[in-house]
Amino acid sequence: MSITQERKQELIKNYAINDNDTGSSAVQCAILTERINNLTEHFKSNHKDHTSRRGLLILVGRRRRLLNYIKKKNVSEYLDLISKLGIRKIK
C-alpha cells in the first residue's frame, strides 16, 4: 500500500519549508500520514492481514516520535501541522 511518486511529490511541495526541502520533519510526517491512511483503508477490506497491521503500528510509532520531536522544537509548528494533517494531539 505504497503511495505514488506523484502523490509524494505533491505532499513534499505542500509541506516543504523551501524548494529543496524533501526530508524535514513536517514532510516526513505528511508522507507517513498518507501511508497510514492508505493502510487503514486496506484493512477495511482485508481485516485478517496481520502482517500489514504490524507494519501499520510501526508507522504510527515512527510518526508519533517525529511529532514529539516537532512539539519539543516548536509548539506552534506542531499545532499547525496536526491541524493540516487532521490528526489528534499527542499527550
Swiss-Prot record:
InterPro entries noted in UniProt: Ribosomal_uS15, Ribosomal_uS15_bac-type, uS15_NS1_RNA-bd_sf
UniProt KW Ribosomal protein keyword: yes
GO annotation, biological process: translation
CDD domains: Ribosomal_S15p_S13e (cd00353)
Domain of life where this protein originates: Bacteria
One term under GO cellular component: cytosolic small ribosomal subunit
Cited function: One of the primary rRNA binding proteins, it binds directly to 16S rRNA where it helps nucleate assembly of the platform of the 30S subunit by binding and bridging several RNA helices of the 16S rRNA. Forms an intersubunit bridge (bridge B4) with the 23S rRNA of the 50S subunit in the ribosome.
Protein name (database record): Small ribosomal subunit protein uS15
Species per Swiss-Prot/TrEMBL record: Rickettsia bellii (strain OSU 85-389)
Species classification: Bacteria, Pseudomonadati, Pseudomonadota, Alphaproteobacteria, Rickettsiales
Name of the coding gene: rpsO
